[in-house]
């Protein structure tokens, strides 16, 4: 292993932005690793993720989906006009910004899929980014994702370019998607999609690069190479990571780049993929891998096992197998059983950090 990524970063701990995000992704490409992007929905899932990255001595991406951001605000808040998703996203960002330095690792603060119908959510967060930028010289979020993969390619590229123009003065990263990722994710259902549209064409990657590069270097592309969101059995999905290799070679040749990997790729719909598929995709320039479904299951499993094991101590506030007057507070205190979910989720994040070669990269 070469020089650790901390040597490259101006901010060593906490939420990183701008050139530091670029340096992190460049370091990832050069050293054949990717950073897992964990969807967080609560303070509890945030700390489970931060703890795993700290213990594995590596960076992490924490991301909020539109639904996850609304959940952060509370299910009792109306989401008319995306107000809960905007308020929850901002609250989560401030929470992560204030807490992340305590874990001593660099963190990329990101928002996940934003389809066309959810653009008012992204607009509201960008308003807040610009306000924060005026005060602090950096945006609130390190990066955002715009997902117009269901729209015509020209509209996708033009609209993404317009958003990158808005983000560029803040040196804010923008992730975009081209080609469809199958399955179901917040607000986007592509379960019945024709298989061929799961594979992005190299001409599209080049068109994106040509449109976005003159605006800003701070962008990445989630390309379809057979990926599917959600839960599926290994072998049911035909992934073709080698397409990413072809895309890189095509773009390199067409733009005359001296880099073998001129494009920063993102791997979506990764739950259930094999370690070999991850490693192959990473070798072709994938710098970020979205992981959500597996983490949700891991979080639940710790709480499930605790509840099943402690069932006789959770039926009443007082009274258990040790005596009808024995209190159960130590068993039903949320800090006890929620922590069980954090522990199992944290363990699962650690597995991802190993699988993607992220562990030890500081």
Swiss-Prot record:
The protein's annotated pathway: Carbohydrate degradation; glycolysis; D-glyceraldehyde 3-phosphate and glycerone phosphate from D-glucose: step 4/4
CDD domains assigned to the protein according to its UniProt record, in alphabetical order: FBP_aldolase_IIA (cd00946)
Domain of life: Eukaryota
Binding site for dihydroxyacetone phosphate: 230, 269-271, 290-293
Cofactors: Zn(2+)
E.C. no: 4.1.2.13
Summary of the function given for this chain in its UniProt record: Catalyzes the aldol condensation of dihydroxyacetone phosphate (DHAP or glycerone-phosphate) with glyceraldehyde 3-phosphate (G3P) to form fructose 1,6-bisphosphate (FBP) in gluconeogenesis and the reverse reaction in glycolysis.
Oligomer and partners: Homodimer.
Family matches, as NCBIfam families: cbbA (TIGR00167), FruBisAldo_II_A (TIGR01520), PRK09197.1 (NF006628)
Name of this chain's protein: Fructose-bisphosphate aldolase
Taxonomic source organism: Aspergillus oryzae (strain ATCC 42149 / RIB 40) (Yellow koji mold)
Lineage, uppermost ranks: Eukaryota, Fungi, Dikarya, Ascomycota, Pezizomycotina
Originating gene: fbaA
């Amino acid at each position: 292993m070469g020089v650790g990524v901390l040597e490259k970063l101006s901010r060593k701990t906490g939420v990183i932005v701008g050139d530091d995000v670029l340096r992190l992704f460049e370091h990832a490409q050069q050293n054949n690793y990717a950073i897992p992007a964990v969807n967080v929905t609560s303070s509890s899932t945030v700390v489970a993720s931060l703890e795993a990255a700290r213990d594995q001595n590596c960076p992490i991406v924490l991301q909020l989906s539109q639904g996850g951001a609304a959940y952060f605000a509370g299910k009792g808040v109306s989401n008319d006009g995306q107000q809960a998703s905007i308020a929850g996203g901002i609250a989560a960002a401030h929470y992560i910004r204030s807490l992340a330095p305590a874990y001593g690792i660099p963190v990329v603060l990101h928002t996940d899929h934003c389809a066309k119908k959810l653009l008012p959510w992204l607009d509201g967060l960008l308003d807040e980014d610009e306000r924060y930028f005026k005060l602090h010289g950096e945006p609130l979020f390190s990066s955002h994702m715009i997902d117009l993969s269901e729209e015509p390619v020209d509209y996708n590229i033009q609209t993404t370019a317009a958003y990158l123009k808005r983000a560029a003065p803040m040196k804010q990263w923008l992730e975009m998607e081209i080609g469809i990722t199958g399955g179901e994710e917040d607000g986007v259902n592509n379960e019945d999609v024709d298989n061929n549209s799961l594979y992005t064409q190299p001409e599209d990657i080049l068109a994106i690069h040509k449109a976005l590069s003159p605006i800003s270097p701070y962008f990445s592309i989630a390309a379809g190479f057979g990926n599917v969101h959600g839960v599926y059995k290994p072998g049911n999905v035909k992934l073709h990571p080698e397409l990413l290799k072809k895309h890189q070679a095509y773009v390199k040749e067409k733009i005359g780049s001296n880099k073998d990997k001129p494009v920063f790729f993102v791997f979506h719909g990764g739950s259930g993929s094999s370690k070999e598929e991850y490693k192959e995709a990473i070798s072709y320039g994938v710098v970020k891998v979205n992981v959500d479904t597996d983490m949700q299951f891991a979080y639940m499993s710790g709480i499930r096992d605790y509840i099943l094991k402690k069932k006789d101590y959770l039926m009443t506030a007082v009274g258990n197998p040790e005596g009808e007057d024995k209190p159960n507070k130590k068993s039903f205190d949320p800090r006890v059983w929620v922590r069980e979910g954090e522990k199992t989720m944290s363990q699962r994040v650690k597995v991802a950090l190993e699988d993607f070669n992220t562990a030890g990269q500081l």
